[in-house]
Amino acid sequence: MKLNFLVTTVALLVAFPPPYECRAIDSSSNQPATDPDGERQSAPVLARLGEEYFIRLGNRYQNSLRSSPDTYPETSQYPKRALQLQLTQRLLEGKVGNVGRWDGNYALRALDSEERERRSEEPPISLDLTFHLLREVLEMARAEQLAQQAHSNRKMMEIFGK
């Protein structure tokens, strides 16, 4: 088991080597005295919404993503990435609704609010129902497993004594 883990770890490190700038975030001793761009690299943003996603702001992987530094200006990437983070969070929370409303069309906003009201009155769609049923089945299986474990523990206590 340990050997499999070691081999897998080595294979992943060989396949995906860590970036050149792999160092502690807030360590003042590891940072160079002068930054070539005059900017500090920003810290990773951890958004936990169901699963953990790391969205990195800044130019940590600049060498691996672009061949030349003049392809995209760095200042225009921050607002785009911030907007992407915000939209991703809203999509994962289910608060966006109709994505087309972001174009500034106010008629779509009115239609979207009417659609939300109508949707709240309707029964849940099949996908929601499927996940609800799956959640209930998993809870029942967990309860059954706990009951079996308790029964097994009682038998062991009877056999070995208290």
Curated annotation (Swiss-Prot):
It is found in: Secreted. Residues 1-24 form the signal peptide. One of its GO terms (cellular component) is extracellular region. The modification Phenylalanine amide is found at residue 160. Pfam families: CRF (PF00473). Keywords: Amidation, Cleavage on pair of basic residues, Hormone, Secreted, Signal. InterPro entries: Corticotropin-releasing_fac_CS, CRF, Urocortin_CRF. Residues 25-119 form a propeptide. One of its GO terms (molecular function) is hormone activity. Gene3D superfamilies: 6.10.250.1920. SMART domains: CRF. This hormone from hypothalamus regulates the release of corticotropin from pituitary gland. PANTHER family: CORTICOLIBERIN (PTHR15035:SF9), CORTICOLIBERIN/UROCORTIN (PTHR15035). Belongs to the sauvagine/corticotropin-releasing factor/urotensin I family. This is Corticoliberin-1. It comes from Catostomus commersonii.
